[in-house]
């Protein structure tokens, strides 16, 4: 049997991290088993579904590179298929028309709740639908079994059993003729030959109802794995108040997809004590049975740590492609300046996100607006004029503009003045970057370029002269 899984989001909002983890688990299992992964858009909620949400889901999946083998399929394009089956079920008694008004159903619900009962349809129209005019407004309900139970072995939670007496007769077609979610899902999984359904634990109560529909259609029942919810660091269900919950918000905040995928796979799945997983390792090691039943808490600090790891360990040229988006977002013109891969190499050790990296690289591409006041007060005093002037003369004559040659030049300048490296390096750092902290100034100058370095030293010398005159 070929394994086939699916990710089937409803396009009523962005792709959130819980959905992304579900998609990842489903995708990994398919790849681990040599199977196929399907993307399906469950857009039967016509009032809430939007094209904007569909675009956001697809964009998120593409950014994570969770590529699908089939799809995207859209439920709204399959209404004829669903309604054809419903008509067949209606004709042979597997479904029936229900004429109960909203007012009656609401009163029924309120009465049951007042008596401490579980709200459920009482089956009034189950055997009396013929008492109403055929063209009167109605819904179609599935005739759920009234005896026995539904049992399934969940890959995460083990054996789960529901008595059929706990289940009511589900509406499978609304008054407006639109088929409902629980019915469409079953038909889709049947038609698309889905063998394993990975989804959130909030779908557990849907599962017995869907299994009964599979059986009524004489369709094979897939296996299920219901994963636990993701909590915020305060133990509450993850929500917007915990920070970013949209996958693309993590992109915007400067995370690499590899970091987010690595983090998400560990939110409920583990392989020993291993924390770092390449995508190839995830595919090789992943199994549904190793998913934890317990809810997992989202820890932003750990995600930042992983992001820093991938910024440092991935090919700088690859990281640079993602950095380019953030440079443009921060309106930094990179057309005149160092290669972005070199910027990644320079700054990866010092940054946790690509947003930070873009911000910290600005002086490599454009002139800084002002020198940091605290850094200038400490390092651009009158005594700094001599080492800056000597260093500038040597830099102007330097033919080999490399990190190594620049390091040797700073050493030679310090030796000639009989001073420590810091007495030359720190004034140069403030002059070239406008900041009190940066990576090694030799590496920085190598990327800034000779012309800009000399001009910035002139700017710093003018600053020192003006400061001394004011004193």
Swiss-Prot record:
It comes from the Bacteria. Its cofactor is Zn(2+). It is found in: Cytoplasm. A motif ('HIGH' region) lies at residues 9-19. Keywords: Aminoacyl-tRNA synthetase, ATP-binding, Cytoplasm, Ligase, Metal-binding, Nucleotide-binding, Protein biosynthesis, Zinc. GO terms for biological process: glutamyl-tRNA aminoacylation. Binds 1 zinc ion per subunit. A motif ('KMSKS' region) lies at residues 237-241. ATP binds at residue 240. Its main location: cytoplasm. GO terms for cellular component: cytosol. Belongs to the class-I aminoacyl-tRNA synthetase family. Glutamate--tRNA ligase type 1 subfamily. Catalyzes the attachment of glutamate to tRNA(Glu) in a two-step reaction: glutamate is first activated by ATP to form Glu-AMP and then transferred to the acceptor end of tRNA(Glu). This is Glutamate--tRNA ligase.
